[in-house]
């Protein structure tokens, strides 16, 4: 009988911990970048192990003569700890837990009731790569909270009550998501020295054009910025020239001026849907010659924007739900076929006054197929 109980205990100890779907999603989200990150300071790594064993989330169980993982890892009460991931979401926490393992790479604290990040909450977490604090009640983050997290790459602060972007963020940060807070201003030195920052998501904040101080993005190489659902009345002119994606949907922009995109010549995706745009000045789109996708749906345009035929790489253009009453035969395609490097894969024109039978078939001569054009209930 004793032998049976002992075997049962060993079986239970060897069982894998249960991961909620949100944890699995977060793990997959950070998997690729984490595997590509050097981990030379990990004392547990063996030089003789293959690449699969060295990855943060190995596809097979770690090698052990007795058990597939440590029986007694240091882990905050109520949390799940595995493969240097500490999963503490949905626990009703009011503060950052103690006893977080020093070698933690990802810390998930979302869906709690944390109001403040204190100076020493992340002290000693020198290997921290991803920190998730979405959907808490944060109003304050201590200026020295990230002093020791010099390897932090992803910081998620969405759905909180922060009135400003935290100061002294790690210079290593590549992705900052601070969606749906109360941020009204981006100060000049907010991103100073953050040369690794590539993604900035800060939609659903009460930010207007005056809230972006001159020089706020000086020296940074951000590729993706989303400031949707804000209070912008025009395209911001002081964003990084390295931008590949700019999403300004659901604002109050009424006009696109000639100089608006002059700084963003590398732009490939532009989101201006659900604004109040009545006019796009001639020549303004010529400043983004590499653009591949433009969203202008749900605005107040009365005509097709000029300059589309000259955009050699444009593949997707959404113009539905506007006030367009006429479409010319050369509004989308160049007169010289060889000028177009990429054919259109999607053109949407439904919910406009223009009738489909009033458009000449040659209007869409540079699309991949008839199904690429959406005219409401009628395809081409």
UniProtKB/Swiss-Prot annotation:
GO biological process terms on file: bone mineralization; negative regulation of tooth mineralization; negative regulation of transforming growth factor beta receptor signaling pathway; response to fluoride
Compartment list: Secreted, Extracellular space, Extracellular matrix
Annotated segments matching region Disordered: 35-59
UniProt feature coiled coil, ranges: none
One GO location term (cellular component): collagen-containing extracellular matrix
Post-translational modification: There is no serine/glycine dipeptide sequence expected for the attachment of O-linked glycosaminoglycans and this is probably not a proteoglycan. The O-linked polysaccharide on 54-Ser is probably the mucin type linked to GalNAc.
Expression sites by tissue: Higher levels in osteoarthritic articular cartilage, aorta, uterus. Moderate expression in small intestine, heart, liver, bladder, ovary, stomach, and in the adrenal, thyroid, and mammary glands. Low expression in trachea, bone marrow, and lung. Colocalizes with TGFB1 in chondrocytes within osteoarthritic (OA) lesions of articular cartilage.
Limits of the LRRNT domain: 66-102
UniProt xrefs under Gene3D superfamilies: Ribonuclease Inhibitor
Keyword set, alphabetical order: Biomineralization, Calcium, Disulfide bond, Extracellular matrix, Glycoprotein, Leucine-rich repeat, Repeat, Secreted, Signal
Family classification: Belongs to the small leucine-rich proteoglycan (SLRP) family. SLRP class I subfamily.
Name of the protein in its database record: Asporin
